[in-house]
Every structure is written in C-alpha cells, then in structure tokens.
C-alpha cells in the first residue's frame, strides 16, 4: 500500500543528513531512516546516526553495501593506507570521492522504500560543496530519479533540500528547524571520525567550520 505522506531519508549522522532528517519530519507525517556501511574507516558514524534517529523517534535500518570498498582502492575514506587530500586537486576530484556511492545508496534506498510503500526519498547532496562530486549534482539526481521510476515502474520523488545551499545556509536551515544545537554538538561530519567540531583540519571540518562562522556572522548582522 502506497503511503503518500511518508519519506525515507538516506542518513549518515552528519550535519547534512541530520538537517535533512528534521526537514523530512517537518514535511512528512511518517519518516524512516536508512544508513549504509560501505567499508568506511570510521564506523562511529553509524552509531551516531542510530542514536540521533532513536532520539527523534525515527525507525532506523542499516544496510551493508561494503562491496563498494572492494571496487576502487583509490578512496581515502575506505582505504586507510591512502593519505587524504586536504585540498581539491585542480584537474580532478579529491580522493575522498567514493565512485558511485550516491547512486548505490539511492538505488538501495528506493528498493527498500518500495517494499515499505514509501515513494519519497530524501538525500543531503549539494552542488555547493567544495568537492564538486559528480554524484552530488542536480542533473545526476534527476537522471537517477527517472531511471529508478523506469526500472521499477513507480513514481519515486527524490528530494534534495540542500542542493543549492552552501554550508552557511545548511546551518541556517538547521536553525530554522530548531535543531541547530543538536547538529552542532551531536553530529559526526569529520573524515577522521571526531564528533561535533571534529578534528578541525580535514576538508569536511574546514567546510563545516567556515559555514558555521559565515552563518553566525550573518545572523549577528541581521540582528543589529
């Protein structure tokens, strides 16, 4: 039975997906979360995601897609022997790029959702992130949305609330949703597996910190 007012969120326990989780709770009467283990070096993010979902009273499911880590040995998030790029290379993507990850996540999420009668999928991808990952682009998401509908003869809708937001605007959205403090203190964005403010020097932490400072400055100026 189709549930038109239900959504499944691709959830990792990081800043973006946590913001999306609460965005979904605002827009849908029933929300579930799916988290993926894909051979990432830091499994703490799974426990963080599980706790946030439980505290938010959101059903949580973990799927094992660790085969991804066997397909490409050149990603620093899944291969501990590779030193992480601190800056984006001029002619390529940083080695934090996991080829096909969002395609796999959304495909498995759609199959899982279909079995639950859910046809709204929510993901925290954004074109505004520094990395320029190809599977975070709006054109990719729209293309995959069409493909999933054709593949299963269904009418899925993939929602991307953060697509055009930079990190400062993601912080702003979390504030509007009333979860700013939760996102700031209870999420895990750091590539080195450090909670909240993180390690401070990996690309994810730099992006998060810069966005926070930009948002707080803008908020202060608007209150004058």
Swiss-Prot record:
Binds 1 zinc ion per subunit. It is an enzyme of class 6 (ligase). Catalyzes the ATP-dependent conversion of 7-carboxy-7-deazaguanine (CDG) to 7-cyano-7-deazaguanine (preQ(0)). Its EC number is 6.3.4.20. It comes from Parabacteroides distasonis (strain ATCC 8503 / DSM 20701 / CIP 104284 / JCM 5825 / NCTC 11152). It catalyses: 7-carboxy-7-deazaguanine + NH4(+) + ATP = 7-cyano-7-deazaguanine + ADP + phosphate + H2O + H(+). GO terms for biological process: queuosine biosynthetic process. SUPFAM superfamilies: Adenine nucleotide alpha hydrolases-like. This is 7-cyano-7-deazaguanine synthase. GO terms for molecular function: ATP binding; ligase activity, forming carbon-nitrogen bonds; zinc ion binding. Its cofactor is Zn(2+). Zn(2+) binds at residues 190, 199, 202, 205. ATP binds at residues 11-21.
């Amino acid at each position: 039975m189709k549930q038109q007012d239900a959504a499944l969120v691709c959830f990792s326990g990081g800043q973006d997906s946590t913001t999306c989780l609460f965005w979904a709770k605002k827009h849908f009467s029933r929300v579930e979360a799916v988290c993926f283990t894909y051979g990432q070096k830091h499994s703490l993010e799974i426990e963080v995601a599980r706790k946030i979902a439980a505290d938010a009273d959101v059903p949580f499911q973990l799927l094992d897609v660790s085969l991804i880590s066997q397909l490409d040995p050149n990603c620093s998030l899944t291969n501990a022997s590779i030193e992480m790029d601190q800056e984006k290379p001029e002619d390529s993507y940083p080695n934090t790029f996991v080829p096909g990850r969002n395609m796999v996540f959304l495909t498995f999420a759609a199959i899982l959702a279909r079995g639950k009668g859910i046809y709204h999928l929510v993901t925290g991808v954004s074109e505004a992130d520094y990395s320029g990952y190809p599977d975070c682009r709006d054109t990719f998401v729209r293309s995959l949305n069409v493909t999933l509908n054709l593949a299963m003869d269904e009418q899925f809708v993939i929602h991307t609330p953060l697509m055009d937001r930079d990190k400062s605007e993601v912080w702003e959205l979390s504030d509007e949703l009333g979860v700013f403090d939760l996102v700031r203190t209870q999420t895990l964005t750091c590539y080195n597996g450090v909670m909240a403010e993180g390690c401070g020097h990996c690309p994810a932490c730099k992006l998060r910190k810069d966005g926070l400072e930009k948002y707080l400055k803008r908020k202060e100026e608007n209150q004058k």
